Amino acid sequence: MTITAGIDIGTGAVKTVLFRVEGDKPEWLAKRNDRIRQRDPFKLAEEAYNGLLEEAGLKASDVDYVATTGEGESLAFHTGHFYSMTTHARGAVYLNPEARAVLDIGALHGRAIRNDERGKVETYKMTSQCASGSGQFLENIARYLGIAQDEIGSLSTQADNPEVVSSICAVLAETDVINMVSRGISAPNILKGIHISMAGRLAKLLKSVGAREGVVLCTGGLALDEGLLKTLNESIQEQKMAVVAYNHPDSPYAGAIGAAFWGAFR
């Protein structure tokens, strides 16, 4: 039996998980997802880890492996570090065993990964554009529109005449949105337009790694945005790809899960 922790330090949040692994049967003990905001991500990771230990009734000495991913390589108490594409692929297959591709949609970039049935990476590609296709950009727009982040997806699905944001540059795209607001364009139509722009680029990213059929699991901070997921599948159909994108309630934890599993089987 192995007890292993996975810590994914991202740009916007720290995701921490704790597993007990016996054979090939993992038991999820505890999890936390903490927004970084203005805090030190490494101190936050340590607080989260200690909180999970307390929740699970464990001591630090009970944990066999502390695996990090994302920006966690400099975390003082980690045992080993794993690259994000490998952890997201492994975590995705745990969450959905049929997943043969992953879309990691994070605060600063998007990443498409093609993987096998074990969660081993076959190829991957990241967005090269600046942040108009990122979670941070969408968060900034939501703040400007005066809406909560968790309202973005549902508002997007209410659009009746979306206004597409064409600019790749985040600064220019934000200027486009300001102009839309001054023209009286509704929040649902603005958000749907942003989703259309993001989804088009993400679908092309999937195609570029050869993900042309099967299940795609969305991971990362934007994975639970149902408006983006709906628009992504619309874009996939338009590009005549035989894949379907899904999410999972625990999609944001995929990187931390994968790190924990790679640590357990070292």
Listing of model-derived features with the role each one plays in the protein:
Residues R37, K120-N161, F261:
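Glycine-rich phosphate-binding loop plus the immediately following alpha-helix
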Residues T2-D8, V63-A67, R100-D104:
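Short glycine-aspartate micro-motif
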Residues Y49-D64, L202-G214:
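Phosphate/pyrophosphate-binding loops at sites that engage ATP/ADP/AMP, CoA/4′-phosphopantetheine
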